[in-house]
Every structure is written in structure tokens, then in C-alpha cells.
Amino acid sequence: MRRILKLHRSLQAPISPVTHNFEFITFNTQLHPKLWLELNNKIFISHPDQGNWAIADLENRMSEPWFDPRGFFLCVINEKIVGFCWTKIHQDLVNKEPIGELYVIGVDSAHSGKGIGKALCTEGLIYLKAKGITQAMLYVDEDNEAGKGLYKTLGFN
């Protein structure tokens, strides 16, 4: 049975910068949908929620009021997208402050272990903090040991 964990961290606590030489750009709704979709489906090939997306799935998310391409970070190597961190701000919480989410995070397996995921997540957290968000959260499968380890280093619990 699949178990999903919801992890949190304060954005009032310091966000440790990550030194890297990666090229980060933000998602362009005209240029990147098909390229991002190919990578997303490759990374999440057997994932029940995130895998096997069609362009309509992405377009549905992009039409949501929370979608902001400035919070959708891509790592590019040799003009190819190799990783991403897509953030989301939940504004619809009754009597609560908005909360930021690291919505979808992925790195091509050919580039795993290089620190791309950590650098992208850090970029996402810095973006959320700059938007005035004080709390961040994410969902992760309980059996995703690599993801849980990464998120712990970023202050999530």
C-alpha cells in the first residue's frame, strides 16, 4: 500500500545557499511544455500521480490560478532540460497564511548525484521566501529514501 508523507519546514529559518555551476532558467510556457513533459514522464515512468502525463495534464495545471512560471525552475545542460523544481503557493487556506509547496521535483537519472536536485530545491525555497511565504511543504512517498534524505538536508521534517 502506498504511503505519502507531508513534510514541512519554516522559511523564517535560514536557507543555506548551495554553491553550483548549473544553469537555471524559469519555465517558458511557449518553449518548454513538450520538453518538460518528456523529462517528467521519463523520471516518473512508474509513478501513479506524476507519470504518464499528456500535454492536457500540464495545460490544466498551467491554467490554475496558482500557476506562476517564475516559480518553475529548470536546470539546463547543453540546452537540454535535466532537472526541475516546480513551486506552488496555496492561497486558499481558510484563516491561515499562504503556504509554499515544492510541488514537483525531478532530475534525469543520467545527472543524479551531482547536486542538481538540492540546488533546484534551494532555488525554489528562496523564491517562496522572497514571495513572503513563511512555511514550505512537500509530499513524498514514504519509500523514496533518496528524496527523504534530500529533504531532510533542506530542513524538512
Could you describe each region identified by the protein language model?
Residues 1-21:
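Acyl-donor-binding surface of acyltransferase catalytic domains
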Residues 1-2, 114, 118, 142-157:
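Conserved active-site alpha-helix within GNAT-family acetyltransferase domains
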Residues 23-38:
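A short beta-loop-alpha structural element at the N-terminal edge
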Residues 47-105:
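A conserved beta-strand-loop-helix scaffold within acyl/acetyltransferase catalytic domains
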Residues 103-112, 141:
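A short, internal acetyl-CoA/4′-phosphopantetheine-binding micro-motif in the GNAT/acyltransferase core
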Residues 112, 121-129:
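A conserved short alpha-helix in the GNAT/GCN5 acetyltransferase fold that borders
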Residues 128-139:
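Conserved GNAT acetyl-CoA-binding A-motif
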